[in-house]
Swiss-Prot record:
This is Large ribosomal subunit protein uL3. SUPFAM superfamilies: Translation proteins. Belongs to the universal ribosomal protein uL3 family. Keywords: Methylation, Ribonucleoprotein, Ribosomal protein, RNA-binding, rRNA-binding. The gene is rplC. One of the primary rRNA binding proteins, it binds directly near the 3'-end of the 23S rRNA, where it nucleates assembly of the 50S subunit. It comes from the Bacteria. The modification N5-methylglutamine is found at Q149.
Amino acid sequence: MIGLVGRKVGMTRIFNEDGVSVPVTVIEIEANRVTQVKTLENDGYTAVQVTTGSKKANRVTKPEAGHFVKAGVEAGRGLWEFRTEGEEFTLGQEINVDIFADVKKVDVTGTSKGKGFQGGVKRWNFRTQDATHGNSLSHRVLGSIGQNQTPGRVFKGKKMAGHLGAERVTVQSLEVVRVDAERKLLLVKGSVPGAINGDVIVKPAVKA
């Protein structure tokens, strides 16, 4: 089963049958329109390419416009691809949120909020050094980043200050609380990566 592309609306809470408050993220999943079907013969692998939403005509490039016209669909806000295994799709086909009606858990992928350049304490949860007792300059610095002559360098991947966020993040096995096909909404328990109105990819959980 493939996934779908949606938009993070925000968080709220609902109450279950026992009156317990459940925190949920609301994901709006408009119809995903098939723009290309990739086959083993033509592309070397099988996949389906989809778009969703809409884009102003003056924001669509000529190659994109031709691609959408060939598929016979309205220009969307982006293109996403899902690998397929035996499923049959046709150009212009619409895939809706109701495909998750029988799914218990999903994996959600999004782009995390960008935090800019951050230090080791915020970026890697390093402990701070002494506030007093002779320490006047090094309260939030990293400390040692390696050895001396041997190896005489800083190892790749060393946790240091740098850009935090604005990267692809996947949260696995989120419980599906409700599928509202009429309003094109999917409610999942807990939080998902990214800012409000950000695009997210929802797939059935691989570890379910």
